[in-house]
Amino acid sequence: MAALRYKADFLKASIDGGVLKFGSFELKSKRISPYFFNAGDFYRADLLQAISTAYAKCIIEAHKSGQLDFDIVFGPAYKGIPLATAATDKLAQLDPETYGKICYSFDRKEAKDHGEGGNIVGAPLKGKRILIVDDVITAGTAKREAIAKIEKEGGIVAGIVVALDRMEKLPAADGDDSKPGPSAMVSSARSTAIPIFAILTLDDIIEGMRGLASPEDVKKTEEYRAKYKATD
């Protein structure tokens, strides 16, 4: 696999652990996908180690390349919460000198009106550079909501890291999927002017799944990419 080692390790763990499944899955877009990735299935300790390592190494790679600088790792409720906390812990393990004092925060779905109150749990966001960690970008709606919450608290969104870029074009308004179009990830990056990084792309999956999945699953995934791949 031409991808970096951590990407290959993450892909293998995802397939072996049943987090990345092959078959027939109806998406929110009503498309029938031959694969499905569910970051919520990283609930076993060894799988959590795999995903936290992948997030941390992707973040370090972006940071060292000068594309990303941040103070706080933020996990949007609900799936983003364990991802952000695990990634923060792994960053400190891998490079304590650089990331030992990095903080994390997450939001509540509903504001708390007693105790410490508010919408945010963890480090205060005001005046800080915030890195959002989440599973995927579909339509970008959830990310825009997270950005709005962070900005309301006075934080500055520095970047977004997701586990998977499906690289597929957004559904056409008129339902004609033969038309070219941008991906959700690129569309979100353009509309927000915030850099977005992905651990894996669909290209990575197809390149790396050979030998880990059946030839029929590889063929169906390649056909899906050919039909729905974004033109950005």
Curated annotation (Swiss-Prot):
Question: Which PROSITE patterns does the entry link to?
Answer: PUR_PYR_PR_TRANSFER (PS00103)
Reactions performed catalytically: orotidine 5'-phosphate + diphosphate = orotate + 5-phospho-alpha-D-ribose 1-diphosphate
Q: Can the keyword Glycosyltransferase be found in this entry's annotation?
A: yes
Q: In which pathway does it act?
A: Pyrimidine metabolism; UMP biosynthesis via de novo pathway; UMP from orotate: step 1/2
- Which UniProt key words apply to this protein? Glycosyltransferase, Pyrimidine biosynthesis, Transferase
List, in alphabetical order, the Gene Ontology terms for molecular function in this entry. orotate phosphoribosyltransferase activity
Q: Entry's SUPFAM superfamilies? A: PRTase-like
Top EC class for this record: transferase
**Disulphide connectivity of cysteines:** none
Subunit notes for this chain? Homodimer.
State the family it belongs to. Belongs to the purine/pyrimidine phosphoribosyltransferase family. PyrE subfamily.
Chain's role: Catalyzes the transfer of a ribosyl phosphate group from 5-phosphoribose 1-diphosphate to orotate, leading to the formation of orotidine monophosphate (OMP).
Q: What is the protein name stated in its UniProt record?
A: Orotate phosphoribosyltransferase
Organism of origin? Sordaria macrospora
Q: Which gene encodes it?
A: URA5
